């Protein structure tokens, strides 16, 4: 039995983590924590998230001393802001904890990336160099050896799962960059109230055009440039990405299908469509990424869907934890 701590437990992702870990037979939740200044400190997690009533009825504690909180803890999940994770992760790592960071603080091994896209100077480049990017289906062997696992972003997870098999099989024409148009539910903006995400204001619209921090994350880990445009959708949760690519001359629909089959036939949390493309409702509330595609000559359109809070965050973090400690990969997830 491993003792685990969730920091940032009051948010949407933190609540999903708590639910997964509470029903995991190998995990014992020692505490649910939030920042010392949080208005949620002292409240029951089940009062903040009523779906947890009768399941997890424990208070959310303020984190005032990370070194003290680390005592007796084996595994830490950081569902916190990027700068908060940047500051906290090294403390828990120094205490010997295995850390799964759901922020962007350790995803890209380039200090300039953080200055440009996150607005802070990275002070822990030693841990940045050691961090393993936790794209579970592709980095399992590295995850097994890691102490710090940087869980990929929600958009990058779906984009990479859709594109990596095609790039590895050299099916795409590199003269045309993949174009990723992605729509996410409002929960992707977090639980904190804002005008943009309020019920009467939310509307389908693009944002972060040419400067969203997930574009360089996707490009870096794919090893190829992409054009990425995220959109805010007028629904609560889920991500749908429509990706337009150009195939190499002579590549057939069967070649594309075989590339996906070879990559994911033994990966239980990626579901492939033999015909048609997935809809958002097929994944909301579930830990899967669903992928379908269509080919017309040299043109390829791939559609990938996931729940942004699950496969795009909490479920992938727990999947990586299962891989790291040798548990069944889908334990507590399905």
Swiss-Prot record:
Catalytic activity: N-acetyl-L-glutamate 5-semialdehyde + phosphate + NADP(+) = N-acetyl-L-glutamyl 5-phosphate + NADPH + H(+)
EC number: 1.2.1.38
Pathways involved: Amino-acid biosynthesis; L-arginine biosynthesis; N(2)-acetyl-L-ornithine from L-glutamate: step 3/4
Organism: Pectobacterium atrosepticum (strain SCRI 1043 / ATCC BAA-672)
MF GO annotations: N-acetyl-gamma-glutamyl-phosphate reductase activity; NAD binding; NADP+ binding
Disulfide-linked positions: none
SMART domains: Semialdhyde_dh
Any GO BP: L-arginine biosynthetic process
Active site: 154
Function as written in the Swiss-Prot or TrEMBL entry: Catalyzes the NADPH-dependent reduction of N-acetyl-5-glutamyl phosphate to yield N-acetyl-L-glutamate 5-semialdehyde.
Location(s), subcellular: Cytoplasm
Keywords assigned: Amino-acid biosynthesis, Arginine biosynthesis, Cytoplasm, NADP, Oxidoreductase
PROSITE patterns: ARGC
Protein name as catalogued: N-acetyl-gamma-glutamyl-phosphate reductase
Designated gene of the protein: argC
Database matches in Gene3D superfamilies: Dihydrodipicolinate Reductase, domain 2, NAD(P)-binding Rossmann-like Domain
GO cellular component, one term: cytoplasm
InterPro entries named in the record: AGPR_AS, AGPR_type-1, NAD(P)-bd_dom_sf, NAGSA_dehydrogenase, Semialdehyde_DH_NAD-bd
Major site of localization recorded for this protein: cytoplasm
Family: Belongs to the NAGSA dehydrogenase family. Type 1 subfamily.
């Amino acid at each position: 039995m491993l003792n685990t701590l969730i920091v940032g437990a009051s948010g949407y992702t933190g609540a999903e983590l708590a639910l997964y870990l509470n029903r995991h037979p190998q995990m014992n939740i020692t505490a649910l924590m939030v920042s010392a200044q949080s208005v949620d400190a002292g409240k029951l997690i089940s009062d903040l998230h009523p779906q947890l009533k009768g399941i997890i009825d424990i208070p959310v504690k303020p984190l005032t001393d990370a070194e003290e909180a680390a005592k007796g803890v084996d595994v830490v999940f950081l569902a916190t802001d990027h700068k908060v994770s940047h500051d906290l992760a090294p403390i828990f790592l120094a205490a010997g904890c295995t850390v799964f960071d759901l922020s962007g603080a350790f995803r890209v091994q380039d200090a300039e990336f953080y200055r440009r896209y996150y607005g802070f100077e990275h002070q822990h480049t030693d841990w940045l160099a050691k961090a393993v990017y936790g794209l579970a289906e592709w980095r399992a062997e590295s995850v097994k050896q890691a102490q710090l696992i940087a869980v990929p972003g929600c958009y990058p997870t779906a984009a990479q799962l859709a594109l990596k098999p095609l790039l590895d099989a050299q099916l795409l024409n590199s003269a045309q960059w993949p174009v990723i148009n992605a729509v996410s539910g409002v929960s992707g903006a977090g639980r904190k109230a804002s005008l943009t995400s309020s019920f009467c204001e939310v509307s389908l619209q693009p944002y972060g055009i040419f400067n969203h921090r997930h574009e360089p994350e996707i490009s870096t880990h794919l090893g190829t440039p992409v054009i990425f445009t995220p959109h805010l959708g007028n629904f609560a949760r889920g991500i749908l990405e429509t990706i337009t690519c150009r195939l190499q001359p002579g590549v057939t629909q069967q070649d594309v299908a075989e590339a996906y089959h070879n990559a994911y036939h033994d990966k239980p949390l990626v579901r492939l469509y033999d015909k048609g493309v997935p809809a958002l409702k097929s994944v909301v509330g579930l830990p899967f990424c669903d992928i379908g595609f269509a080919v017309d000559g040299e043109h390829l359109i791939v559609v990938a869907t996931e729940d942004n809070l699950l496969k795009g965050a909490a479920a992938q973090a727990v999947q990586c934890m299962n891989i790291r400690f040798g548990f069944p990969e889908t334990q507590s997830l399905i």
